Amino acid sequence: MTGLDTAFNYNGFASHRTLARIAPDLLPDFDLSTKVGYFPDGHDLDPQRLREAVEQSAEDLGRIPDTVLLHNPECSPGGLSPACAALSQMRDQGLCRAWGITTWDPRPLRHATRDIPCPDVVMIRTGLTVPGSALDAAEEFTERVKPLHRWGMAPFAGNTTDPLWTTVDTALFLAPGQQATAVQAGIATAFTLPAVSQLAVGTSSLDHLAELASGARLETNAKTMTRYRVLLRQTATVGERDTGERNSSAASHG
């Protein structure tokens, strides 16, 4: 593990100061990414507020962030273009080394990407917990904005105790001959669903962190992963058809 990912608003807007206080000697050794876009009064992509947040982040951390990500711009899609231009300018001015976009659900951004500069990074949800429509939208979004790197996040949607991890045989997604826990298999699939070069995960346990790191070394079964995507799309299509039929029936009897 060589990276740390945080955000301006994490830990009650105190995450940067907390990191600087508990690990001042270690921070320079990590590739540090943070996010801006949330403020005490809510989500805002105003360029001046974003600049102030980035400047405050560097001051609180005692160093400039390696990467600054625009935090969930789907909450304010109309502000995406000027916000991206502002972060790109901040990178060029030395307030960070790279900039990018992190989005939990890129579907609202489909028609908001026309005028934005190409980001260095896009971070998206990956893995078995992501709905098929969100996976397709994430791939479409990265195709449109053409980042240099694509990172993943939230492979367990914040809950490793979800019944999914005990009721589904996640070993089916791995190449044959590998032994793994469900969590490790979840990590492996998150690196390939869709393909990402880095994966951000949250943990408060060293044992859990070691388990997650082991999962990153596993190889997935390409045929199974492809079949899974096909099934996701078929399921979505059936769901849309059923919804349409119910709506048509309701309209005809209204």
Give residue ranges: language-model regions.
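N-terminal binding-site loop/beta-alpha segment at the start of enzyme catalytic domains
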Residues: 1-30
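Hydrophobic beta-strand scaffold residues
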Residues: 3, 32, 148-150
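Glycine-centered flexible beta-alpha turn that most often forms the glycine-rich phosphate-binding loop
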Residues: 4, 65, 99
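Beta/alpha (TIM)-barrel catalytic core signal, keyed to glycine-rich beta->alpha loops juxtaposed to Asp/Glu
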Residues: 9-12, 72-254
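Acidic (Asp/Glu)-rich catalytic clusters
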Residues: 19-31, 55-63, 89-91, 112-117, ...
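A short, structured active-site edge motif that brings together acidic residues
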Residues: 28-41, 70-71
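Glycine/small-residue-rich loop that forms an oxyanion/phosphate-binding "nest" at active or ligand-binding sites
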Residues: 43-56
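Active-site groove signature of glycoside hydrolases
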Residues: 58-77
